[in-house]
């Protein structure tokens, strides 16, 4: 099992170097322009201040920039950290919805990845913009402005069946989430469907999951304020995703959110209509909105997190590994991130 952290704050590159020293395998840098620092700037600093930890976007949002711009961005980082750079890429949950815009559609997303993939191989490929199509290719590759000689794996973010199938069809890996991406066996079955469509092998394919973790100390209870603050922002980020997903898809909410679904919708409807999209995602994986703390109950914590004493967490992670999961990543609340990545490394990773 591989372990990763997530960060995005330009002046806290020390968190990444600390994670590297603690034995973490990889780091995701988020791409959410209305909330976080610019991912390319963060990655450039991380590349220069680390030596072994793998770094990349987790995830770059296709709707925010042209495909050649994304390819150039990650290839530039690869020049600074050759052989340990990857590109996580998605349609855009928070990044698009925080502007009141929908994520990119699946057909456009597949074409976007195709273009990025070809460019990162140094190839010429047809590219269409504003209805006009021309061949494009990175020029003057021998000048080393970028690095497309060392492979850059593309990990496709897939929290639903369609994008999970797409990951299996064209990606080098899948990034899903627990619980909102379904179970790992379900996700991998979708990946296999995608691979079967193009008759490709999944021999080197890797699957990663964004998880919510809660490591309890002796005597701690799920109702303790410190416990709620530790896992609350991650849980509510999942809730915010489901609110938009149900609204856009027309699908019923998943079972794990039903215990407080109606109550949360009533709460959300009372917000300023014009700014609902901003308020919904403002606290995204950073802090627990005080007005939302009431929704974090012991039952909800159990449904949304890998929780328990360290030994119990080890067993839960080993079970996920047995299903075929290759790596997990978590996002710690901003004010607790150093302590949590250290506690997790000392008490869980070291026992794996």
Q: Where are each of the predicted segments found?
A:
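Active-site mouth loops of central-metabolism enzymes
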Residues: 1-10, 60-68, 148-159, 213-216, ...
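Alpha-helix-loop-beta-strand connector modules within alpha/beta enzyme cores
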Residues: 40-57, 112-115, 119, 344-352
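Conserved, mostly hydrophobic/aromatic
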Residues: 23, 46, 77, 116, ...
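N-terminal beta1-alpha1-beta2 module of alpha/beta enzyme domains
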Residues: 1-58, 152
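An alpha-helical appendage that flanks or caps ligand/catalytic pockets
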Residues: 102, 106-143, 189-319
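Glycine-rich, proline-tolerant flexible connector loops at the mouths of alpha/beta enzymes
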Residues: 26-49, 61, 93-96, 178-181, ...
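Hydrophobic faces of well-ordered beta-strands that scaffold small-molecule active sites
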Residues: 3-7, 27-29, 54-58, 85-89, ...
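Short, acidic/polar
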Residues: 8-19, 73, 158-166, 227, ...
């Amino acid at each position: 099992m591989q372990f990763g952290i997530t960060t995005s704050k330009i002046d806290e590159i020390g968190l990444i170097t600390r994670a590297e020293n603690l034995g973490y395998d990889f780091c995701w840098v988020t791409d959410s322009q209305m909330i976080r620092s610019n991912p390319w700037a963060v990655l450039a600093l991380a590349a220069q201040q680390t030596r072994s930890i793998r770094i990349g976007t987790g995830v770059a949002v296709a709707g925010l920039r042209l495909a050649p711009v994304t390819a150039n961005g990650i290839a530039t980082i690869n020049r600074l950290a050759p052989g340990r750079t990857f590109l996580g890429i998605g349609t855009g949950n928070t990044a698009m919805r925080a502007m009141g815009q929908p994520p990119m559609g699946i057909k456009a997303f597949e074409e976007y990845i195709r273009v990025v993939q070809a460019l990162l191989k140094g190839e010429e490929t047809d590219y269409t913009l504003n209805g006009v199509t021309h061949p494009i290719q990175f020029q003057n590759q021998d000048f080393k402005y970028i690095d497309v000689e060392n492979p850059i794996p593309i990990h496709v973010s897939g929290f639903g069946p369609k994008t999970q199938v797409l990951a299996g069809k064209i990606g080098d890996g899948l990034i899903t989430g627990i619980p909102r991406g379904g179970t790992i066996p379900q996700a991998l079955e979708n990946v296999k469907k995608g691979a079967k469509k193009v008759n490709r092998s999944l021999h080197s394919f890797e699957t990663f999951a964004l998880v919510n973790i809660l490591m309890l100390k002796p005597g701690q209870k799920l109702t303790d304020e410190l416990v709620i603050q530790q896992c609350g922002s991650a849980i509510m980020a999942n809730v915010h995703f489901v609110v938009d997903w149900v609204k856009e898809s027309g699908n019923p909410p998943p079972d794990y959110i039903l215990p407080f679904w109606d109550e949360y919708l009533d709460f959300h409807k009372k917000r300023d209509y014009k700014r609902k999209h901003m308020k919904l995602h403002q606290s995204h994986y950073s802090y627990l909105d005080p007005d939302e703390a009431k929704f974090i109950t012991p039952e909800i914590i159990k449904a949304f997190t890998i929780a328990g004493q360290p030994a119990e967490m080890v067993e839960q992670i080993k079970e996920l590994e047995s299903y075929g999961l290759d790596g997990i990543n978590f996002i710690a609340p901003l004010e607790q991130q150093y302590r949590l990545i250290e506690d997790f490394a000392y008490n869980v990773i070291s026992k794996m």
